C-alpha cells in the first residue's frame, strides 16, 4: 500500500486527454488551458484513422470550468493514480489514453489507461464530460478553416488543420520523378504579409508527401488567407 499523496492546494491551469496508438492510426485529443481570470481555451482534435481529415473545434469557455474539474479531481483523489500498478490485461491493437493535470504551483499529475484504474474512474470521466458539455453551451465557438483552395499542379500544397495557433500543411508530389522544393514560407491575410519563415528545402520522391507545420504567435482572425511555399500556394478561409 502506498501512502496517499496530499491533495493539491493550487489552481488547475491545464488538463488534457489524449487517445492514440490504435491499429487504424487514429488520434483524439481534448485540452483545456487557462487563458486569464475569465476564460479558458477548450480544444478538440479528432482524426478517425491515419490518413483521414482532421476535425478541429475550439471554444472559449468560462475559466470556472477548470475549477469544477479540480473539484472532481479532488473528489476522486486523482493525485494518487500515478502510483497505481500497471494493468495485467491489455490489447495490442487498442488505443492508449493518457490524462494530464497541470497546476499553478508547478505540480503535474500524469497517468494513462495502461494502469489498473479503479472502476470509479469511469464515474469521474462522466462528471468531467458533463461539466464540459455545459461549458460549451455557454461558450464561444472560435473561427476555423471552412474552405480551402489547394494548388492544383504536380506539386500540391494544402492545409491539414489549424489547431491551437498551429497550421499543419501537406506537400504532395504527384509527378513521376523526384522533386526538390526550396522556398520561403509566407502567410498572407489579404495583401498583408503576417508570417514569414526562413527557407525550407524538401526532397520528395514520386507519389510521396510531406507533412509540416508553422506556429503562430496569435490566433487568426476571420478572413481570407494565402499560404505560400516557393511557387506553390494554398488559399483558405477562416470563419
Tell me the role of every PLM-derived stretch.
Residues 43-56:
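Acidic/histidine-rich, surface-exposed loop or edge segments in extracytoplasmic proteins
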Residues 66-68, 115-130, 191, 203-211:
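Short, surface-exposed linear segments at secondary-structure transitions and domain or protein termini
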Residues 207, 216, 221-225:
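A glycine-anchored, Pro-Gly-centered beta-turn/N-cap motif
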